[in-house]
């Protein structure tokens, strides 16, 4: 009789233990939030984009970061501004063959057709390549037509990242149209370009899906540190266009004595030092080139590290010298 009661008591204790057992801990928020979950969660999570994984990826590919949309994006890409025709197609194919897995284009560049062709002809599965494009302000009044045009010209099934190219009238209207395409699965992530502290702070409360990335002019002569830190604090990635100076200013930057000295000490080019400096600040880069040697050079930046002293010397080069009109 006593034995029977003991067995019953043990069974009850066992049931209670099972019902209150803790679930094994989850390593990170990205383990449980999928891209589909994040579509309607503009706060998703506050990512730390101030530090990147800086070791070369598999087969020479650039490492990736997890965007707040739940998708992964390479931290080095090919910029295609000024690339046209077969030169653009071949540059995209060359970049992909050398390990690039991110390609940046825009309606304003006039080369979405060529970029799409380069991606399709690369021989690399579509899902391994991250393609970003941008709507221009003159498209914001009829954004649905503009988005459909981008999809048609690229002809790659879906767009990994679509950005607003500049602030402007109807930019919120255009972004809200982009949000609809995210929910429909035709665009995966959204971003903005040329948005600084006031612009991004005014913009965020007006939209549903949080931008994953802000693309701004950034180079050693215009480091924009306050803006970079502010955007990082919002859990948004930062990307540099004009990382090497741009529009008539590249030669001066690439011959800067401080940068030349640092480059020589590492056996690297000045361009490689600048790109590495960006990455060590947590800034994504999209250098452009049609020269296969330069394209290869621009992704060969994962086998050296700038010292704290070198990073400080480059920081001292800041002139607040902005080279673009916006």
Describe each model-derived feature in a short phrase.
Residues 54, 166-326:
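Beta/alpha (TIM)-barrel catalytic core signal, keyed to glycine-rich beta->alpha loops juxtaposed to Asp/Glu
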Residues 6-14:
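Bacterial N-terminal signal peptides
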Residues 83-86, 104-114, 136-142, 167-171, ...:
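Acidic-and-aromatic substrate-binding clefts and catalytic sites of carbohydrate-active enzymes
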Residues 126-139, 160-167:
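A short, structured active-site edge motif that brings together acidic residues
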Residues 21-129, 244-246:
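N-terminal binding-site loop/beta-alpha segment at the start of enzyme catalytic domains
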Residues 144-164, 180-184:
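CE4/NodB-like, metal-dependent polysaccharide N-deacetylase domain
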Residues 83-96, 139-155, 198-201:
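Short, acidic/polar
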């Amino acid at each position: 009789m006593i034995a029977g009661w003991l067995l019953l008591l043990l069974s009850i204790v066992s049931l209670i233990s099972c019902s209150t057992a803790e679930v094994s801990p989850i390593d990170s928020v990205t383990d449980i939030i999928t891209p589909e979950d994040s579509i309607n969660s503009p706060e998703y999570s506050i990512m730390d984009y101030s530090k990147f994984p800086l070791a070369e990826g598999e087969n020479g590919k650039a490492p990736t970061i997890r965007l707040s949309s739940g998708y992964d994006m390479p931290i080095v890409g090919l910029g295609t501004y000024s690339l046209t025709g077969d030169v653009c197609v071949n540059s995209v194919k060359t970049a992909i063959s050398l390990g690039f897995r991110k390609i940046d284009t825009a309606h304003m560049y006039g080369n979405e057709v060529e970029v799409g062709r380069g991606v399709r002809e690369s021989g690399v599965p579509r899902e391994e390549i991250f393609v970003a494009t941008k709507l221009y302000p003159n498209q914001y009044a009829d954004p649905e037509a503009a988005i459909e045009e981008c999809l048609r010209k690229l002809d790659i099934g879906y767009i990994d990242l679509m950005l607003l190219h500049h602030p402007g009238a109807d930019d919120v209207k255009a972004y809200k149209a982009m949000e609809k395409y995210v929910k429909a699965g035709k665009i995966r992530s959204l971003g903005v370009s040329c948005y600084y502290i006031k612009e991004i702070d005014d913009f965020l409360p007006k939209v549903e899906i949080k931008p994953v990335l802000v693309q701004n002019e950034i180079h050693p002569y215009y480091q924009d540190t306050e803006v970079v830190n502010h955007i990082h604090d919002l859990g948004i990635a930062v990307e540099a266009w004009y990382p090497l100076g741009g529009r008539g200013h590249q030669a001066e930057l690439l011959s800067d004595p401080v940068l030349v000295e640092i480059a020589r000490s590492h056996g690297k080019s000045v361009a490689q030092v600048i790109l590495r400096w960006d990455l060590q600040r947590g800034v994504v880069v999209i250098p452009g080139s049609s020269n296969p040697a330069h394209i290869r050079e621009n992704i060969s930046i994962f086998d050296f590290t700038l010292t704290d002293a070198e990073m400080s010397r480059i920081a001292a080069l800041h002139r607040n010298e902005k080279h673009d009109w916006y």
